[in-house]
Regions:
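Conserved beta-loop-alpha segment that forms the PLP phosphate-binding cup at the N-terminus of a helix
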Residues: 123, 127, 143-177, 194-198
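PLP-dependent aminotransferase-class I/II
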Residues: 175-241, 251-254, 259, 289
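Acidic/histidine-rich catalytic neighborhood
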Residues: 220, 227, 266, 277-278, ...
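Active-site C-terminal subdomain of aminotransferase-like
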Residues: 293-339
Length: 339
């Protein structure tokens, strides 16, 4: 372990010394970030060619390692530059960076309450705060049947929601009978590609996916959704999952959650709301109308790492009934049991 006399690890004195240098390096980086070209200035393989072919037999001083960052700089795309407008927003901040150091430095594995009560309870409580801050229905709070959890990305949040929907639609029999041929999922033609991947990973198969037409603003057309659902039911399929998007990646289109939600309620279909891109806008009361209809949602995800100055990766998933997820996902051996 790290201590004042360690011969196998960095000593605590050396850790302090090098830590100051890292903070200085980062502070200097942010002070001059606008001077760098936003996009990387290298060709494929150019950075790797500067690295040793084999791992060194002996370690190097931390000073040398930090100096190597100067070699890496031409190969960096500067996501934190104010001139960066590609892909999606992903802004960090000083408090987030320092908090990440504490989280990494304490080395806690907060996979359940027993492994770190503080980690679990703070996570749960802060996500309850988010429900209030964003004006979301109270059913997403841990004090109700629902609750929230931090995930790495909205892709994994969607996968978890889809598995919950799969088991809900099949009355928990999907894993037993392994028959995906009758379950169907519905998304707009503008939905994120991760949903199609989730459908494949969850075992439904790509043929179960229904792409619903969009209007001139690239939002899902509810009447087209209902038409396809009724046709599938007539053909012997079981509609299991509908995904509405708040801010598509291509065009930031907003699907009409309220109208879609009413259809899902009528046919008892799981409604997942993917607000990864624009959900954080609900922190401002004047934009909450974009999420009207969340009362109908069974699950909801958005990414604080996009607009909330939080380090990547931080996605949050809220569900209206956590037992629908735990019953679908839980495997609890002795070493993972809480008191």
């Amino acid at each position: 372990r790290m201590n004042k006399t360690s011969k196998l690890h960095m000593t605590t004195d050396e850790f302090r010394k090098q830590g100051y240098k890292v903070i200085d390096w980062l502070a200097d980086y942010y002070e001059k970030i606008e001077e760098f070209p936003v996009l990387s200035q290298v060709k494929p393989g150019e950075i790797r060619a500067k690295l040793p072919e084999y791992a060194p037999e002996n370690g190097r001083s931390y000073n040398d390692i930090l100096n190597d960052m100067d070699l890496m700089m031409p190969g960096m795309t500067h996501w934190q530059s104010p001139n960066f407008h590609a892909f999606f927003p992903c802004a960090s901040s000083g408090p987030a960076i320092l908090a990440d150091m504490i989280a990494t430095g304490t080395g806690i594995v907060g996979m359940l309450w027993e492994t770190s009560p503080s980690c679990t309870e703070v996570e749960t409580h802060v996500l309850d705060w988010l429900v209030d801050m964003m004006g979301m229905p109270n059913k997403f709070k841990s004090s109700s049947k629902g609750g929230g959890v931090i995930q790495d990305t909205a892709s994994s949040s969607t996968l978890i929601s889809l598995i919950g929907a799969r088991e809900y639609a099949s009355n928990g029999e999907f894993n037993s009978i392994n028959d995906s041929t009758k379950l169907t999922a519905y998304v707009s033609s503008q939905s994120h590609s991760s949903i199609e991947k989730a459908i494949k990973v969850a075992g439904l198969g790509k043929d179960s996916m229904r792409f619903i037409d969009v209007d001139e603003k690239f939002a899902m057309i509810p009447s087209k959704l209902k038409e396809r659902i009724t046709q599938d039911i007539a053909d012997g399929f079981t509609p299991a999952f509908v995904c509405a998007t708040v801010g598509t990646t291509n065009t930031t289109a907003m699907d009409p959650i309220d109208e879609i939600g009413k259809i899902c309620k009528e046919y008892n279909i799981w409604l997942h709301v993917d607000a990864a891109m624009a959900g954080a806008a609900a922190l401002c009361p004047e934009f909450r109308y974009l999420q009207d209809g969340l009362d109908y949602a069974n699950s909801y995800t958005f990414n604080p790492h996009k607009w909330m100055l939080t380090n990547f990766d931080c996605s949050v998933l809220f569900v209206d009934d956590r037992k629908k997820i735990t019953s679908a996902m839980s495997v609890v051996p002795e070493y993972l049991k809480n008191k």
